[in-house]
Amino acid sequence: MIQVLLVTICLAAFPYQGSSIILESGNVNDYEIVYPRKVTALPKGAVQPKYEDTMQYELKVNGEPVVLHLEKNKGLFSKDYSETHYSPDGRKITTNPPVEDHCYYHGRIQNDADSTASISACNGLKGHFKLQGEMYLIEPLKLSDSEAHAVFKYEHIEKEDEDPKMCGVTETNWESYEPIKKASPLVVTTYQRYVELVVVADHRMVTKYNGNLIIIRTWVYEIFNTINEIYQRMNIHVALVGLEIWSNGDKIIVQSSADVTLDLFGTWGEIDLLKRKSHDNAQLLTPTDFDGPTIGLAYVGTMCDPKRSTGVVQDFSPINLLVAVTMAHEIGHNLGMNHDENYCSCGGFACIMSPVISPQPSKLFSYCSYIHYWTYINYRNPQCILNKPLRTDIVSTPVSGNELLEAGEECDCDSPGNPCCDAATCKLRPGAQCAEGLCCEQCRFMKEGTVCRIARGDDMDDYCNGISAGCPRNPFHA
């Protein structure tokens, strides 16, 4: 029998209109103190894991009760995820820390179809969620009452620097970039792609965070949890395969010129990093103040290139959402996306590929970005992001039509009664196209255009593509 255990925490909210408080995210002049209440459904007598696969919290926002549903992001890390740092004498130290039982979640607000959430539950709730079209941040308060949290809007954070923050990419930035020419009708791709990414934190990051590698690691995880969520909408699985921290000094000369730094980082990645850590893309994270308003730079349309599948990103804000959006932007350039024009829209807010960081940050790509990405996939066809990860590569939650298989398997051997799968060989039976999935019926792919997932709220239906068992996400989702 399932019993619902209510973790009894006072469900109260005390708005501090017009007051100011110093938080990790900065000085906030309008916020609420809330006490989230966790609701856990466990079998009677079951031992509660440290970090459950799914969690639910009740709290008040603007005095109104909301329910936050969270699900552990099991696609965040690759199973061979590794971390590298350096001893004072320069020795390379590489470890494979256990990451399966991590504390990073994605989620939504109950009864709000347009809501999203990216939350760290490591020490209280820290992150951001979208509610009724507005972005809110949440973080624990460092008070004697450890359950108190602050909830506030991004615009209520006092800005020390009002200068615009921009990406440094221009159409003529790189001689090696040839604009993609339309040679035939564009084919909209619904196949999932997989980007295996390494983040490199330079020595200034070590100095900025007082040599605390754990803090740097946590910061990168928070950023990457949001990046992973952002790209899910494009049916791209971005997984963190490695983190390298230049703890004893930089391996390149990190300069204020973003162009020079990007070139040096790409060269180092090709001759050093790639030879010891397989990956599709690498991003350098640095507090270095680049020249002018630039906070990031990347090559355009270079995913899988040994040197140029790279970007550099300034760690310019204590708000992980802003740094995550910037890194997602630079990865977007690597995936063939150009900057949004004025007519490219995301429901009234600036989109991911806007050349300027918006006062109202968005986690959405514009339709223009989808067109750029599909065009790039059609005419450049980067091969490294086509391979479907195996369980030896990616830790991910199995979902209908998208099971992750062991090496050599075509279907899940754990289902001996499946008429489409030979349980002895883990191969599809003769004549079978598939064994399971929302678009698999009687061992055959369902016809293209068959609805496989009904829309919820203002969302859009998802359709089978006729060539796979999975139910691909509709590329026109908001």
Swiss-Prot record:
EC number: 3.4.24.-
Motif (Cell attachment site) on chain: 456-458
Domain Disintegrin positions: 397-478
Positions of the propeptide segment: 21-190, 390-413
Entry's Gene Ontology BP terms: proteolysis
Subcellular location per the Swiss-Prot or TrEMBL entry: Secreted
Keywords (A to Z) from UniProt: Calcium, Cell adhesion impairing toxin, Disulfide bond, Hemostasis impairing toxin, Hydrolase, Metal-binding, Metalloprotease, Platelet aggregation inhibiting toxin, Protease, Secreted, Signal, Toxin, Zinc, Zymogen
Organ and tissue specificity: Expressed by the venom gland.
SS bond partners: C304-C384, C344-C368, C346-C351, C411-C426, C413-C421, C420-C443, C434-C440, C439-C464, C452-C471
GO MF, any single term: toxin activity
Co-factor note (free text): Binds 1 zinc ion per subunit.
Active site: E330
Binding site for Ca(2+): E196, D280, C384, N387
Keyword Protein transport: no
Signal peptide coordinates: 1-20
Cofactor needs: Zn(2+)
Residues covered by the Peptidase M12B domain: 193-389
GO terms for cellular component: extracellular region; plasma membrane
Primary residence: secreted
Enzyme class: hydrolase
Quaternary structure (record): Monomer.
PANTHER family from the UniProt entry: ADAM A DISINTEGRIN AND METALLOPROTEASE DOMAIN, DISINTEGRIN AND METALLOPROTEINASE DOMAIN-CONTAINING PROTEIN 28
Entry similarity comment: Belongs to the venom metalloproteinase (M12B) family. P-II subfamily. P-IIa sub-subfamily.
Stated name of the protein: Zinc metalloproteinase/disintegrin ussurin
Native source organism of the sequence: Gloydius ussuriensis (Ussuri mamushi)
